[in-house]
Amino acid sequence: MLNMESPQMYADAVQTLAHVDLKKQPQPLPQQATIGQITLTAMSSAQQQQQQQQQQQQQQQQQQQQQQQVTTDANNNATVQDAALLVKQHAMQQMQLSNNNSNNLLQKQMLQQYSTQTDLDELTTQEITLDLQHLIDDQFRDTETLGIFSDMVTSPGGLSATLPPSGMVSAAAKVLQQQQQTLANARQQQHSYGRAALAYMRQAVHSNATYNNHSSDENSSVGSDSSSTIKEEPIDPDYRRHLQESVTGQAAAAFINNSNGLYNAYQSNNLSNNNSSSNNSSNNSSNNSSNSNTNSTNAAQFTNLTTANVLAHHSLPHLTANTAQQLLKHHSKLQQTQQQHAQQQQQHAQQQHRKHSNKHVDKGTEEYRRRRERNNIAVRKSREKAKVRSKEVEERVKSLLKEKDALLRQLSEMTNELSLHKQIYMQLMNHTNPEVSRVCRSFLNTNEHAL
């Protein structure tokens, strides 16, 4: 047999043998043909498998390249986002630094203003010596002397004496006085000041107060005739009027209530007088005649004094006219917005009520159709009547215009006749006959008066 090295050589040998057999024998063998076909199909299938493997390898390479591109794009996007975040963080840090710097500057300015105001107050305040013996004696006088705390705010001179010269808080002080007068009756049975309460208080008590003290002690430093008066500049009436017009009662009351307890003054009126009448009755019986004579003058002794929490420019150096006005304006704006919001809500509620109050009408019923027909007929009739009226009015206007033209023509004719008559009479006046001239003059005068 033949030694075959490759399938191709085997196939060629098979074909040659087949041809030889065909030449020798007229009938071919079926087995040899099937073997050749099998070998050919095996060869083609092997080649197809190789091609499929190559295609799969190419597809895998393409997929790997696409994955690499996706990963590179994601990395690029991540780097861009990181850079944007870094820029934002840097901007936020700069904003925080600028805000901190501005806050520090504002705090420094506020401290400087406060220090300057306190320095000015220390320079402008007058030193008034206190009569301690007289103050101690005042605590055990009659019932009127113990009412100084309630009279400090409610008295007309108490607030006017402590107002600063510029009148920066006059409106707020007036509102405070009104509020305390209204709350005094409600709190009359709850609060009371004891006998041991001092007749003077700290801070802004002796800033602008006027003392009319008549001491019973001969060795006291303040005599009966000594009184310290402080002259103040008059408040500008225009400025006061402007404050009174701009400040409403509700806004000022809300401003006082919302000012973090700056105006927690003594809000009782004549409380200590009512609570200490029984205690002072025994003390008045044991006092000397000189003390009894000075009771009337000691009643209004410290009425001009103010407490530490009452509006005073010494105890509140940070409160200025501009800040008070700004707060009041802000509160008034808030009230206006609240009122507008309430009105809008009310209108909306009314509209909804009207919508719900309308009856549901079925448009498919005969009654609805009859009503619609009646309404249409009424509308048509009213339109026809309006057209007729408009035509009548137009005709009337035309007739009136014609009458006006005729009257104007008559008027022009009459004026022409009058001018002719005047010319004739003027010529006749120059006539030699005096009687004719006299008649013409009288006629002209009567015509002028008639005209």
Swiss-Prot record:
SMART domains: BRLZ. InterPro entries: bZIP, bZIP_sf, C/EBP. It is found in: Nucleus. The keyword DNA-binding applies. Residues 365-428 form the bZIP domain. It comes from the Eukaryota. Keywords: Activator, DNA-binding, Nucleus, Transcription, Transcription regulation. One of its GO terms (biological process) is border follicle cell migration. Signal peptide: none annotated. GO terms for cellular component: nucleus. Residues 210-236, 267-298, 328-389 are annotated as: Disordered. It holds the Pfam family bZIP_2. Residues 218-228, 268-298, 334-350 have a biased composition (Low complexity). GO terms for molecular function: DNA-binding transcription factor activity, RNA polymerase II-specific; RNA polymerase II cis-regulatory region sequence-specific DNA binding. Residues 359-370 have a biased composition (Basic and acidic residues). Residues 369-398 are annotated as: Basic motif. Residues 400-407 are annotated as: Leucine-zipper. PANTHER family: CCAAT/ENHANCER BINDING PROTEIN, CCAAT_ENHANCER-BINDING PROTEIN GAMMA. Binds DNA as a dimer and can form stable heterodimers. May be required for the expression of gene products mediating border cell migration. Among the DNA sequences that this protein binds with high affinity is a conserved site within the promoter of its gene. Belongs to the bZIP family. C/EBP subfamily. This is CCAAT/enhancer-binding protein. It comes from Drosophila virilis (Fruit fly). The gene is slbo.
